[in-house]
Design a protein with these regions (language model features):
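Short, charged, surface-exposed hinge/linker loops at domain edges
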Residues: 1-8, 41-74
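Short, positively charged
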Residues: 2-3, 9, 13-15, 33
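Short aromatic-glycine-(Arg/Gly/Cys) micro-motifs in beta-strand/loop hairpins
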Residues: 11-26
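Short, surface-exposed helix/turn micro-motifs that flank interaction/cofactor sites
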Residues: 22, 40-41
Length: 74
């Protein structure tokens, strides 16, 4: 078992149902699910596979990034 890591994810409710989820710190690491819980379970698997691929290729594992919320008037 590897080192525990935490990543921020972006969970989006889709218009046609279900959820999509992505990991800003891991470009291209995305998944989806019918429910919020399923989408989160699927992204955990996707993150693990993504990191395993990086390790297999000798690439560095990105750390978490900082996410800030901003307010705009539009």
């Amino acid at each position: 078992m590897g080192t525990p890591r935490e990543y921020e994810v972006v969970l989006t409710a889709e218009e046609d149902g279900g959820y999509s989820v992505s990991v800003p710190a891991l470009p291209g690491c995305t998944s989806q699910g019918e429910t919020r819980d399923e989408a989160l379970a699927m992204i955990r698997e996707a993150i693990e596979a993504y990191i395993e691929s990086l390790v297999a290729h000798g690439d560095p594992i990105p750390g978490p990034i900082e996410i800030e919320r901003v307010t705009v008037t539009a």
